[in-house]
Amino acid sequence: ALPIFCSGRLDTHIQIDTKDELLQVASNFNTIATQFKSLLDVIRQQNESKQLELETMVQARTAELALSNAALQAVNARVQEELMLAHDMQKAILPQHFPHGPGIEVYAAMHTARELGGDFYECCALPDGRYGILVADVSGKGVAAAFFMAVSRTTILDLALSGDSPATVLAHANDSLCLHNPLDLFVTVFYAIYDPASGRLEYANAGHPPALLRAPDGSVQELPGSCDLALGYMSAVNYQEHSVV
């Protein structure tokens, strides 16, 4: 009987035509087999229920992941659209033509490390025959940074046209930007005034990497001077001014 039960045939009942102790043994085997079969049926039903529950959970989780993925794709599409808009704004800000005159020729090129940077530059003719030269970099990226870039450029250029010294222009621009900076952005700026009549370059630096001066023999050196606080951090900052000929 034991080999029969071990083979899984638990619905088999042992038939013994005797009244001795073998009958009791057979009866016990039959009882155990019936109980064991009932227990296996319960376990099988529980496993099927758990399997169904697990499949339902997997399907629900898969649906959630699909929704999350769709939401992420939508967010990414909006981010890319914003970056493209900011990129177009940046291109519109950068000048396409520069002033030229006796003793000065201006050229510019920019190679960004990322698809969108916060760099901008400008050269403007001042009323007294000198030229204002601006190189700057706004923190952050996206439309907000591009807008702050436009505000910074306009603010600095408006002040530059007054003909004030580079240190004065940066100080006034900093105070103005600190008043209109809800996102706490900042801009590093190198601003210089070049006088083609004397060959003198006066400049001030607000947190920007040092400018490089290339000599007629091709050698390049950093312009000496301090690197003061970037614009937009805090108001009432004094900027140091330097000059070279």
Where are these regions (language model features)?
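Flexible, glycine-biased helix-capping/connector loops in cytosolic signal-transduction modules
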Residues: 1, 7-11, 102, 129
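The cytosolic transmitter module of two-component sensor histidine kinases
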Residues: 10, 18-25, 47, 102, ...
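HAMP-domain connector/hinge
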Residues: 11-22, 111-112, 125
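Amphipathic coiled-coil signaling helices used for dimeric signal transmission
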Residues: 3-4, 17, 21-49, 53-67, ...
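Leucine-rich amphipathic alpha-helices with coiled-coil/heptad-repeat character
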Residues: 5-9, 36, 43, 50, ...
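Extended hydrophobic/Leu-rich segments
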Residues: 2-7, 15, 215-218
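… and, occasionally, acidic/histidine-rich disordered N-termini of signaling adaptors
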Residues: 64-245
